[in-house]
Design a protein with these regions (language model features):
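Glycine-rich phosphate-binding loops of nucleotide-dependent enzymes
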Residues: 2-258
């Protein structure tokens, strides 16, 4: 339904000179769905996320949030509108506690600072938001642990908690499972399965098994162009996708199983 659309791009493009990083991309992202975005390196996935969070302005085209155009706004206004972004590389403050990491993010939500000079009421709101975010990702037992001392997988969970602390309605996640082992990846998969019941999630991920398991809708980009958007089954069945991304590996597996 149209009223489920919380984020939309219309003919979105980003060019640097003659390089077309993203070209004429029109997509719709729906509430309480996980929308996967895949493609090879250089396909334009991170460029898309950078524009969806306001940190990169499009060369042409528009971005709409709940029907209102937002691509001309400052990045902090994207945050205030409930659009939260994580990054491909771990983006935490390693020298402070997990709680303080989330509090730093939560202060953007309230427009204040988590410090001794802020009002007691302001600090209480920020602390509560930080504690709730940690609990949502299963890190409530790590509240007072220095971020550098937790495992890599937990650091990725912490980064998601930092996004949740801003009180988003849309989560933009850039390869949250990068560099993880199977067990750590599975924890993130279960976390995202739960979170997509509440949020619109746009997930860029190279782990194809994870993206197939999680996605309600899946978009494939190729050299900055939109190749296909559909269900996982529709994407897997598309001959262009099989040739370009899934390729011979899936065909070989089917032949061996026959």
């Amino acid at each position: 339904m149209a009223n489920d659309i919380v984020l939309e791009t219309e003919a979105l493009s980003k060019h640097w000179g003659g390089i077309k990083a993203l070209n004429d991309i029109s997509l719709q992202f729906r509430d309480r769905q996980l929308h996967g975005v895949v493609g090879p390196n250089g396909a334009g996935k991170s460029t898309l996320l950078n524009m969806l969070c306001g940190s990169l302005k499009p060369t042409s085209g528009c971005i709409f949030h709940k029907g209102q155009r937002i691509d001309t706004l400052k990045p902090w206004k994207f945050v205030r509108r409930g659009i939260g972004r994580s990054f491909q590389k771990t983006n935490i403050y390693p020298e402070v506690t997990c709680l303080e990491n989330c509090a730093i993010s939560a202060q953007r939500r309230f427009g204040g600072n988590f410090n001794l000079f802020a009002s007691r009421h302001s600090n209480q709101m920020v602390r509560k938001a930080a504690e709730e975010a940690l609990a949502q990702v299963g890190l409530e037992g790590r509240t007072h642990t220095i971020a550098a001392e937790i495992s890599y997988g937990e650091q990725r969970q912490l980064e998601i908690a930092m996004v949740l602390a801003t009180d988003p309605c849309i989560l933009l996640l850039d390869e949250p499972m990068a560099g993880m082992g199977h067990e750590e990846s599975q924890r993130i998969i279960e976390l995202l399965k739960e979170r997509k019941q509440t949020y619109c999630i746009v997930l860029v991920e190279h782990d194809m098994d994870a993206i197939f398991e999680l996605s309600d809708q899946l978009t494939v980009l190729d050299n900055g162009r939109h190749l296909i958007t559909g269900t996982v089954d529709e994407v897997r069945a598309d001959p262009r996708v099989k040739e370009a991304y899934l390729g011979a590996e899936e065909d070989d597996a089917e032949e061996q199983a026959a």
